[in-house]
C-alpha cells in the first residue's frame, strides 16, 4: 500500500448543458426499493472515463431541487467540486436521501444499512447500462461511512471498482466509524485522502492510522495527505481544512487521476 433483481423506474426531471464545457446535467428520480425513489444529480462529460458516486457528509439530506440546486449541503466538499470532477472527464452521480428518509435524521443511522446498499445498487445498474465505464464510490466525512459500507456489501457483485475516502470518520460518535468496518475483507483499491491539519473531533489526522492499518494489504491502496489551503469556521465544517478549502482543484485532480489509473 502506498503512504434480488431491481425494477428501475427513471424519471428525467431536467437536463441542460454547462455553458463552458461539454458537461450535461440531469436530475434522475430512480426507483430503488418498493415505493421508494432516490433523486440523483448526474453530471456527464462527453466521453467519460469513469463514473463516481459521491456521498456528501453530515446528515446527507440534500433535498435536490429539479433544477439541480439543493436545500442543504451546497458547501460540502464533494458538492461544491462536482463540476471540477465532471470537467476532468468523469461522470458524477450525487445521491440524495431516499424518499423514505427525506426528513430528519435523513441518512444518519442509515448509512450502514442493507436498504442503503440496495438504493446504491440500483444506481450502479443505471450507470453501468448508461455508460459502461468503471464505477467508484467516493465519500467525504460522514459520507465515507456510506462509501465504505456500500463498497464492502457490493464488492462481490462486481458493481464497484473501488472506493475513495476523504476526511474519513475515524472514531465512534453518532455513527459507524470507518475503521470499525470490515475493510480487511475489501479486495479492491482504496484511496484515502486526508488533510494533516484536520482537527475535526471525529476525523483528526492523528487518528488516521486507525484506518490505514485496517486496509487489505493485497490491494492497490494509497494514502494521500494534503497540507496546504485555508481554514474558516468550525473544524468539522466544509470550509475548514476538513473540507480542503482552497485546494479543491488539487484534491479533485488527484482523485480523478488515481481512479482512472486504477
Q: Could you say what each language-model-derived stretch is?
A:
Residues 21-47:
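N-terminal cap/lid segment of alpha/beta-hydrolase-fold proteins
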Residues 82-103:
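Conserved alpha/beta-hydrolase
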Residues 218-262:
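C-terminal catalytic histidine-bearing segment of alpha/beta-hydrolase fold enzymes
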Residues 45-84:
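Short, surface-exposed "cap/lid" segments of acyl-processing enzymes
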Residues 125-185:
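Primarily recognizes the serine-hydrolase "nucleophile elbow" in alpha/beta-hydrolase
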Residues 3-15:
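Sec-dependent N-terminal signal peptides
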Residues 162-226:
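The feature captures the conserved acid-bearing segment of alpha/beta-hydrolase catalytic domains
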Residues 77, 103-130:
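Alpha/beta-hydrolase active-site loop
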Amino acid at each position: 500500500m502506498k503512504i434480488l433483481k431491481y425494477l428501475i423506474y427513471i424519471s428525467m426531471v431536467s437536463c441542460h448543458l454547462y455553458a463552458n464545457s461539454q458537461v450535461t446535467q440531469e436530475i434522475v428520480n430512480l426507483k430503488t426499493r418498493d415505493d421508494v425513489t432516490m433523486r440523483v444529480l448526474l453530471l456527464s462529460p462527453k466521453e467519460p472515463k469513469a463514473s463516481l458516486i459521491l456521498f456528501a457528509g453530515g446528515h446527507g439530506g440534500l433535498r435536490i431541487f429539479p433544477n439541480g440546486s439543493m436545500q442543504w449541503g451546497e458547501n460540502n466538499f464533494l458538492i461544491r467540486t462536482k463540476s471540477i470532477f465532471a470537467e476532468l472527464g468523469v461522470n458524477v452521480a450525487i445521491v440524495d436521501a431516499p424518499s423514505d428518509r427525506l426528513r430528519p435524521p435523513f441518512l444518519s443511522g442509515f448509512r450502514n444499512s442493507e436498504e442503503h446498499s440496495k438504493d446504491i445498487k440500483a444506481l450502479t445498474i443505471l450507470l453501468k447500462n448508461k455508460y459502461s465505464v468503471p464505477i467508484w464510490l467516493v465519500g467525504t466525512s460522514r459520507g465515507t461511512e456510506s462509501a465504505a459500507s456500500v463498497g464492502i456489501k457490493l464488492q462481490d457483485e462486481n458493481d464497484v471498482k473501488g472506493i475513495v475516502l476523504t476526511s474519513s470518520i475515524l472514531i465512534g460518535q453518532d455513527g459507524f466509524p470507518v475503521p470499525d468496518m470490515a475493510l480487511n475483507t475489501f479486495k479492491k483499491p482504496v484511496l484515502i485522502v486526508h488533510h494533516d491539519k484536520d482537527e475535526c473531533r471525529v476525523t483528526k489526522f492523528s487518528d488516521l492510522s486507525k484506518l490505514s492499518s485496517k486496509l487489505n494489504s493485497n490491494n492497490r491502496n494509497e494514502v494521500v495527505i494534503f497540507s496546504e489551503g485555508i481554514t474558516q469556521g468550525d473544524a468539522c465544517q466544509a470550509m475548514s481544512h476538513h473540507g480542503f478549502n482552497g485546494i479543491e482543484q488539487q484534491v479533485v485532480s488527484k482523485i480523478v487521476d488515481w481512479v482512472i489509473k486504477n
